Amino acid sequence: LPIYHGTSDDTLKKGAGHLEGTSLPVGGPRTHSVITAHRGLAEATMFTNLNKVGVGDRFTIEVMGEVLTYEVRETRVVSPEDTRFLQTQDDRDLVTLVTCTPLGINTHRILVTAERITPTPQSDIDAARQASQIGFPWWAVIFAVGFSVIALFFWRSGYMIPPKKKEEDIEGEADGDEL
């Protein structure tokens, strides 16, 4: 899920948004990044299952070629105005994931706060590399081969698009000169 700057409606339609005024999600001591996303959208999962995340679960953020692993320390439901759990804390590297609840009513917020695990486990680094590898575009090969076979068929069968008639031929036909 891509993370964009800001939390406008347009931003949250594309992916998760970084809450302005909080630390950027780049890690480091005394940082607390807040990432928000929608849930319950028909066209995207985003944070739909955030209510199922529990203490001890882990997630990763890939930023600037580095993989950061976070382990969930607490989950809570708060009113939208309650921001006391989003403050930085001495020497802690925190990320809080936020979405609306109850689904469809959206009167409260789910906060899932996690602390960074250092060093990043090798298994998380390997998983991030594997997920970011783009597969070979086999669809392009299939399209090119299919197009080539069809073109070869038409060429070998002698089927040609009739050439355009010249202007004088058209005028001659109109005058009845053609036999």
Where are the model-predicted features located?
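Alpha-helical transmembrane segments
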Residues: 145-160
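Solvent-exposed, non-transmembrane regions of membrane-associated and secreted proteins
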Residues: 1-140, 158-178
